[in-house]
A protein has these predicted regions:
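Glycine/Thr-rich phosphate-binding loops that ligate phosphate moieties of nucleotide
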Residues: 42-55, 59-256
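Conserved active-site beta-strand element of glycosyltransferases/polysaccharide synthases
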Residues: 32
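Conserved phosphate-binding catalytic cores of ATP/NTP-utilizing and phosphoryl-transfer enzymes
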Residues: 2, 12-29
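Short loop-beta-helix segment that forms the pyridoxal 5′-phosphate
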Residues: 2-11, 201
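Alpha-helical transmembrane segments that form the membrane-embedded catalytic/substrate-binding core
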Residues: 8-18, 207, 212
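Generic recognition of flexible, low-complexity loop/linker segments
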Residues: 7, 19-21, 28, 101-103, ...
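Short beta-strand scaffold segments in enzyme catalytic cores
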Residues: 17-20, 38-42, 115
């Protein structure tokens, strides 16, 4: 059904297209994808390899580059798991909206509730890990658990970022956040606080298609380079800045 002579372009993997579509192609930039599989990735002009496969290095959608990527297999799948405990399928959006509103009033650290997010073990980093919810008291309710899940995922990705920073010899200073989870103000703010850097939300949270479109545009000479394409197709809609008091709390939790 495709028209004759229509160019067919191989764009790259989904997360690699997300990295390009987010505008993460310079030294010191990283992109978090809060999807079913949660990832943090950078673009590197130099090939790096983790011998234990703690993270994977994929061919980038950007010419002459690579994408080191650390992932949590059960990322925002845990939000779906949470919803299944408290709502029917049709009520998921209503429950998430309610949780995002109530979680705004919960302090960093979720009043001592901690979620270890490895419902599926990480084969290299934590091969024997199992998910855990720690610190429960009669004070906690579902919004505490919701926020603790988001915090636990961000802690785990920060763990992976440290490994990538060391191997690629770069310090990340600029963070883009994409995927369905980026629609949550609570998720965006705690990400800025846990990583202690501005977290940028893009106008379009599903940037995989944008990255693929950029690859197609490059192939038919629509753009001079990736930078021009990103400038024309990707916009930052809001930046969340770290809150000093929250950063101190999260640093204490992460380091201990």
């Amino acid at each position: 059904g495709l028209p004759e002579n229509l160019p067919i372009i191989a764009a790259g993997g989904d997360k690699q297209c997300e990295t390009l579509g987010s505008g993460c192609f310079k030294h010191g930039q990283a992109v978090i994808s809060y999807g079913t599989l949660a990832t943090i990735a950078v673009t590197s002009k130099k090939y790096v390899q983790n011998k234990n496969f703690t993270y994977y290095t994929w061919p980038s959608s950007i010419r002459g580059a690579w994408n080191p990527e650390f992932n949590i297999y059960r990322g925002y799948w845990l939000v779906t798991w949470f919803c299944r405990q408290y709502a029917k399928e049709k009520d998921f959006p209503d429950l998430i909206n309610e949780m995002n509103e109530k979680a705004k009033d919960i302090p960093p650290g979720s009043n001592g509730l901690f979620v270890y997010p490895f419902w599926t073990p990480h084969p290299a980093l934590y091969p024997l890990a199992k998910g855990a919810i720690l610190g429960c008291t009669d004070y906690h309710n579902k919004e505490h658990l919701y926020k603790a899940i988001l915090e636990g995922i961000a802690y785990a990705l920060k763990d992976g970022l440290h490994l990538i920073e060391k191997d690629t010899n770069q310090k990340i200073k600029e963070l883009y956040v994409v995927g369905g989870g980026s629609k949550s103000d609570v998720a965006m703010q705690l990400t800025a606080d846990i990583f202690n850097m501005p977290a940028k939300r893009l106008q379009t949270h599903e940037v995989c298609a944008i990255g693929a479109a950029i690859n197609a545009g490059m192939a038919i000479n629509m753009f001079l380079n990736e930078e021009e394409a990103v400038k024309n197709m990707t916009k930052v809609s809001k930046v969340f800045y770290p809150i000093k008091g929250n950063v101190q709390v999260y640093d204490d939790i992460f380091n201990n």
